[in-house]
Amino acid sequence: MIAPRIALQFLTRLPVSLPGMPTPEQIGRSLLWYPAVGLLLGLLLWLAHLLLGQTPDVLQAAIILALWVGLSGGLHLDGLADTADAWVGGFGDPGRTLAIMKDPRSGPIAVVVLVLLLLLKFAALLSLLQAGQGIYLVLLPWLGRSLLPLLLATTPYVRAGGLGQALVDHLPRRQLPWVLGGHVAAMLLLGWGALIALATALALFVWLRRALMQRLGGTTGDTAGALLELAECAALLALALSL
């Protein structure tokens, strides 16, 4: 099957090759595999936690966070940085916001937002490890990447052309609710913490989607990446605060 390999190649830096250029339909079907890719990343983080069992918690949290960023190649952090710059510099104007978002250069707002996000993730991750709740490392990337197909299925895509447009146009919408429902049910097997994380991430999803609709009339690839990073951070903070 080529769809899961497309999802792996796009969302991770794992060595995955494709037999050829995928069709738009295959690209669209790959969205169904985003939650599974998130689960795989979560399992890798949990495995790292188990292998680092004798490492001091502070060092372990730093290593796991670096691995977390490295496995995705910083793809979603880049989207968050672009979104932060554009949101502040756009002054409420949709066209200006989209133009700034497309600029590859990062301004001071992007740097500040990234530093704050990584600082919050590190502190919350450290609290989680100190409480002996490393199992939730499985949940966070899984939950974050499950929100991407939900966003693209419910929100207009405002930047015509490219990979994002193919994802939206060819997303298997009839199958998506079943796929997401199955993953959510599996997440809840992790206990009450999973329910807290899920509720937090969904609340952030509703708030951010509304903000995107008001400012841009839809979403872009960058804002999807921003959603993922913010949802992971919010869920991680909620877990840490609930311990």
UniProtKB/Swiss-Prot annotation:
> What EC number(s) are associated with this protein in UniProt?
2.7.8.26
- Which cofactor is recorded for it? Mg(2+)
One cellular component term (GO) for this entry is: plasma membrane
Alphabetically, the GO molecular function entries are: adenosylcobinamide-GDP ribazoletransferase activity; cobalamin 5'-phosphate synthase activity
The answer, when asked if Cell membrane is one of the entry's keywords, is yes
Q: What are the GO BP annotations of this UniProt entry?
A: cobalamin biosynthetic process
List the pathway annotation. Answer: Cofactor biosynthesis; adenosylcobalamin biosynthesis; adenosylcobalamin from cob(II)yrinate a,c-diamide: step 7/7
Q: What InterPro entries does this protein's entry cite? A: CobS
Q: Which enzyme type, at the first EC level?
A: transferase
The annotated topology with respect to the bilayer is:
Multi-pass membrane protein
Keywords associated with the record = Cell inner membrane, Cell membrane, Cobalamin biosynthesis, Magnesium, Membrane, Transferase, Transmembrane, Transmembrane helix
What subcellular compartments does it reside in? Cell inner membrane
TM segment ranges: 31-51, 61-81, 109-129, 134-154, 188-208
Q: What is its main location?
A: membrane
Q: Which reaction does it catalyse?
A: alpha-ribazole + adenosylcob(III)inamide-GDP = adenosylcob(III)alamin + GMP + H(+); alpha-ribazole 5'-phosphate + adenosylcob(III)inamide-GDP = adenosylcob(III)alamin 5'-phosphate + GMP + H(+)
Which HAMAP family does the record cross-reference, listed alphabetically? CobS
Q: What functional role does this protein have?
A: Joins adenosylcobinamide-GDP and alpha-ribazole to generate adenosylcobalamin (Ado-cobalamin). Also synthesizes adenosylcobalamin 5'-phosphate from adenosylcobinamide-GDP and alpha-ribazole 5'-phosphate.
Q: Which NCBIfam families match?
A: cobS (TIGR00317), PRK00235.1-5 (NF001278)
Per the similarity annotation, which family is this?
Answer: Belongs to the CobS family.
> What name appears for this protein in its UniProt entry?
Adenosylcobinamide-GDP ribazoletransferase
